[in-house]
Amino acid sequence: MKYSEFRRWLKAQGVEFQTGKGSHFKVSLNGKSTVFPDHGAKEMGEGLRKSIVKQLGLKD
């Protein structure tokens, strides 16, 4: 999955994005937050994707 596709999926789940440094965003949902690196069209590692989903308390 590409970073841009995952970003769209997160937005569809109701995740709020706040600006961070460079290409990174602070994302939050229901009091849980983490950092999302957005590198556009590059492929995202599966471990990073699963980690962000887990940290936000979302289901795959």
Swiss-Prot record:
The keyword Plastid does not apply. InterPro entries: HicA_mRNA_interferase, HicA_sf. Gene3D superfamilies: Hypothetical protein. The keyword Nuclease applies. Keywords: Endonuclease, Hydrolase, Nuclease, RNA-binding, Stress response, Toxin-antitoxin system. Signal peptide: none annotated. Its EC number is 3.1.-.-. GO terms for molecular function: endonuclease activity; mRNA binding. It comes from the Bacteria. Toxic component of a type II toxin-antitoxin (TA) system. A probable translation-independent mRNA interferase. Belongs to the HicA mRNA interferase family. Probably forms a complex with the antitoxin HicB 1 which inhibits the mRNA interferase activity. This is Probable mRNA interferase HicA. It comes from Pseudomonas fluorescens (strain Pf0-1).
